[in-house]
């Protein structure tokens, strides 16, 4: 070994110290030492620096041995790019230097080359020769360049508020969601097999006179439902039917589980009461451990997505629903909930109820019967060269959802005319103004500009939906405004149809809400439109 040094250490001393931390004197750790010292020498004196390593192997230990940067204090970041490189940089400005092991400089170093490029199998590597080559090569096989670290890396993210996970009851960062990451399945441990209560089972021939512990489901070609209900006494006449259902042994209520377990019917009732909000109802009699939610009125279904995801992360609990923002009919089912096992652990039930304690999962909002006006723009229509077909199309959609059309008008593609007509319709009492066409990039299309002249504010122009990408939303005073692009004339369903129910329900719409429409926002333009019984808008 030569007399090269790594910082304050001889190579032998460094290898001994490295072995104490790393477990053995790894070649990558020795190279990491040379790389750290080279990077330090290239920084201005007195620089308060932080470090980035581009591989999780060996390099982080070299940085932690030779600097005050560590994973624990947040000054060492491991960004696994698979490259044997590191960077030291000014923690405030981000200006720094990157050092890497340069494969182009290894022709004279066969042991290093075989190790780095994995052309020499590990069992054939001569560790003594390899370490000797690394010691003699030192920084001569390294290259470096100036780098500027991205602002997003310099930004120090605060952990934020700490919450107690409703499942495991341990503290965790609230930013991770409603349940800690360990309880979402990211824990690196084998999950224990789910435990359950000891239940009383009897052979079918011995079940006569016993009380059924749960609904026993019968499935035929035409129906599915309970043949024997929970709490029902099993009679001799039931045995053949139960055998035909494949029942040879049945659960009976001879042994009641202890207080740590909750029967599916009791558990699902507790969950349903916590989930149902305004405009939602459900039967107080569970069927097969399940409860179905119904709309108590015609309206817009609102599902709290964060709560929905979190409650489904609680073990042994499930709830499934139709999509949020769909128009639902009174007395039609839209969601169902049930525990997975016959008896739900009280801890799981408590966790689910804790998730649901802040707000209801489901609401059905009333659709307001807004007094509406329709403003058609287009010189060709105003002059009678083209017959208007927009008014009946838009009017039908408004009236279908309970709105009334109090006035209509047709004006040319003229900013002043559009602004004046807008004001007339608002003065006539319009609570919702729907304009048609004039929203594209053509120079004659000035509908948006005319609306702005009339006082349009809170403007959202454009949505990731096809058809209907050039939809416009906004308000003039207390009057809400929706601009329908020309595609609304030939396409049966557009972005207007997705958003009109939200407007009528008084739901605030922001840019993020529009962005979320992109997933499912491509209409297949079927010859026979079946919306909303299709994927569009979902």
Specify the residue positions occupied by each region the protein language model found:
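Short, low-complexity N-terminal leaders and the immediately following helix N-cap/first helix
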Residues: 195-288
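Glycine-rich phosphate/diphosphate-binding loop of Rossmann-like nucleotide-binding domains
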Residues: 359-413
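A short glycine/serine-rich beta->alpha loop
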Residues: 16-25, 259, 320, 485-488
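Non-transmembrane, aqueous-exposed alpha-helical and coiled segments at domain scale
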Residues: 1-25, 32-194
């Amino acid at each position: 070994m030569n007399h090269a040094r790594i910082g304050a250490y001889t190579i032998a001393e460094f290898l001994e110290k490295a072995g104490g931390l790393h477990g053995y004197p790894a070649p990558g750790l020795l190279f990491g030492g040379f790389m750290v010292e080279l990077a330090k020498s290239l920084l201005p004196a007195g620089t308060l620096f932080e470090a980035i390593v581009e591989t999780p192997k060996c390099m982080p230990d070299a940085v932690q041995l030779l600097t005050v940067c560590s994973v624990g204090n947040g000054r060492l970041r491991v960004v696994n790019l698979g490259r044997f490189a590191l960077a030291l940089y000014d923690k405030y400005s981000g200006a720094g230097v990157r050092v890497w092991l340069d494969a182009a400089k290894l022709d004279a170093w066969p042991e290093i080359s075989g190790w780095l490029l994995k052309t020499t199998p590990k069992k054939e590597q001569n560790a003594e020769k390899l370490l000797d080559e690394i010691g003699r090569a030192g920084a001569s096989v390294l290259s470096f360049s100036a780098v500027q670290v991205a602002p997003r890396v310099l930004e120090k993210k605060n952990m934020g508020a700490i919450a107690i996970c409703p499942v495991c009851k341990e503290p965790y960062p609230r930013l991770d969601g409603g349940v800690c990451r360990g309880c979402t399945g990211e824990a690196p441990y084998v999950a224990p097999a789910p435990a359950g209560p000891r239940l009383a089972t009897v052979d079918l021939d011995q079940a006569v006179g016993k009380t059924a512990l749960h609904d026993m489901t019968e499935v035929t070609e035409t129906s599915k439902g309970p043949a024997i209900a929970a709490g029902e006494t099993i009679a001799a006449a039931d045995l053949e039917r139960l055998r035909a259902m494949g029942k040879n042994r049945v659960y009976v209520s001879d042994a009641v589980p202890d207080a740590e377990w909750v029967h599916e019917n009791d558990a699902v009732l507790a969950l349903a009461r916590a989930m149902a909000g305004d405009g939602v109802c459900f039967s107080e009699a569970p069927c097969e451990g399940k409860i179905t939610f119904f709309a108590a009125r015609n309206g817009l279904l609102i599902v709290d997505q964060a709560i929905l995801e979190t409650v489904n992360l609680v073990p042994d609990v499930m709830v499934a629903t139709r999509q949020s923002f769909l128009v639902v009919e009174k007395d039609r089912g839209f969601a169902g909930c049930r525990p997975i096992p016959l008896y739900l652990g009280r801890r799981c039930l408590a966790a689910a109820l804790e998730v649901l304690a802040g707000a209801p999962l489901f609401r059905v909002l009333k659709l307001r019967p807004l007094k509406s006006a329709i403003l058609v723009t287009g010189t060709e229509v105003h002059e009678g060269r083209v017959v208007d077909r927009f008014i009946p199309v838009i009017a039908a959609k408004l009236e279908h959802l309970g709105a009334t059309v109090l006035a209509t008008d047709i004006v040319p593609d003229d900013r002043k005319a559009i602004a004046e007509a807008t004001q007339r319709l608002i003065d006539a009492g319009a609570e919702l103004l729907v304009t048609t066409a004039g929203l594209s990039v053509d120079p004659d299309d000035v509908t948006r500009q005319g609306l702005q002249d009339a006082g349009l504010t809170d403007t959202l122009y454009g949505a990731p939906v096809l058809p209907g990408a050039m939809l416009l939303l906004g308000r003039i005073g207390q009057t809400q405004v929706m601009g329908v692009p020309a595609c609304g004339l030939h396409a049966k369903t557009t972005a207007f149809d997705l958003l009109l129910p939200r407007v009528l329900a008084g739901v605030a719409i922001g840019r993020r809400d529009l962005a979320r429409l992109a997933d499912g926002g491509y209409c297949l333009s079927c010859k026979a439109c079946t919306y909303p019984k299709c994927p569009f808008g979902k």
